Amino acid sequence: MLPMAILPNGDRWCHGCRQRYLRSRFPIFSVDGSRTLPTCPYKWPNGQGDVAKFLQGIENRDLWEKEHGQIYRIWSGMKSEVVLTQPSHLQAVFRDSNKHSKAENNNSGYLMSELLGQCVGLVSRERWRTLRAVTEIPFQHDKMPSYLELIQRHTRHHFDRLLASGDLRQERIHPAQDLKMLPFWVVAEIFYGECDAEMKTELQQLCVLREDLFKRMIQGGIVRWQWSKYLPTATNRALAEFQRRWRAFNQRAYDRACQQQRILPIVLMIEAAREGSTSVEQIYQTIDEALFANLDVTTGGISWNLVFFAAHSDIQERVRQEVLSATDHDAYLLSSSTLLAACISESARLKPLAAFTVPQSAPTDRIIGGYNIPAGTNLVVDTYALNIRNGFWGADSQCYRPDRFLEHRATELRYQYWRFGFGPRQCMGRYVADLVIRTLLAHLVAHYELGWVEPDPGKNSTWQRDLESWITIPDLQLRCVQRRND
């Protein structure tokens, strides 16, 4: 007798069974019980995650919202995720975000668990509070003045190298590729102190290994399942090599700091783990999150600013004059009320780092958009709907106008704008990220003039992005001419 899956219409039968099973396992009804929540069809094996949600999220979010409305459901693997698109949805959900739980392994499965499943960004409740207390100290707001010299030094040296051996010699710059490693080395020095040549070589090699593993994780499939760890695959071999070398690197960095009698974050974190407040693996994965996982994140945050400056020479010149007229340069870089800071916020508004946020769940039932969402249901935010399609931003919401951020107080933007998250679980590295971006852009506009290689840049929605990256980053070159007074 032939298996059902290879009988005529067998695939359709299996598909229908999966749909019915998932809807019965994760039932969501309207408040009056007359309707079920609109839901994207489950597609074996990944559902709408992670390729459809991240790599293709910008295009898919439009299609899904048009088909299903302002609140609907997608599947990440076989996990239910409810998509929120309106500020009113966020008000109902995030009022107690400190009590929320992040989705286990980001709903991405086994390989993600081995890379980041225990990092501070993905654990919840008491585990999160304990780990955050151990790891957040070097990233607190009051530490930023002490990093100014470090960040400015790395910025100068990075541009010197680009001028000596990069395309900058030909007055060209690729914002993502050419600036990718600058924030990486800044964060590495915060954790480990100034890295010697051997440490830099090992970190660069680990970057390549880690990037390949993350790309494989995004593709999903077999690496979602726990049993895949027993298979003799290239992915498992690469994972074992990365974990072995990453643990060894951090142990050597710890030993080096102890020998030098330096109280660096790597020392404080590992000693906290050895005292039992957290685990060494949680520390390693949290450093991984800050260095490797956030490599693309910070690259995206930096690089779109250059593209917008190239397309808007008037704004670029205004920022340049602001930079040159600052009487206290350090205070200027630390300020959040400058045109420079507004430009960074506006770039992040128009080019959110990802189309959907990391899934998390509320501890109690919520009524959202006329539906009763049970406690523990994973929720994600459509960042384009919030940052661009939101009526709060006015008729010019799709236009680049940084001054809009000088017209609103920060409290007015709550639930209207997504960048680093919401509430106490906002990104731990947000202050360092902002300081790196401000320093880089201030250096750039003071010493270089950005322009478009092509005569007509077109609309920002048509600018080429890297289609292989889970983060929205540009894939294009700009004209970058050193100013004559330099």
Curated annotation (Swiss-Prot):
What protein name applies here? Answer: Cytochrome P450 monooxygenase aclC
Report the source organism: Aspergillus oryzae (strain ATCC 42149 / RIB 40)
Question: What family does the entry list?
Answer: Belongs to the cytochrome P450 family.
Q: Which UniProt keywords apply?
A: Heme, Iron, Metal-binding, Monooxygenase, Oxidoreductase
Q: Look up the record and name the cofactor or cofactors this protein needs.
A: heme
Q: Which InterPro entries match?
A: Cyt_P450, Cyt_P450_CS, Cyt_P450_E_grp-I, Cyt_P450_sf, Cytochrome_P450_Monoox
User: Recorded E.C. number(s)?
Assistant: 1.-.-.-
A single Gene Ontology MF term assigned here is: heme binding
Pathway assigned in UniProt: Mycotoxin biosynthesis
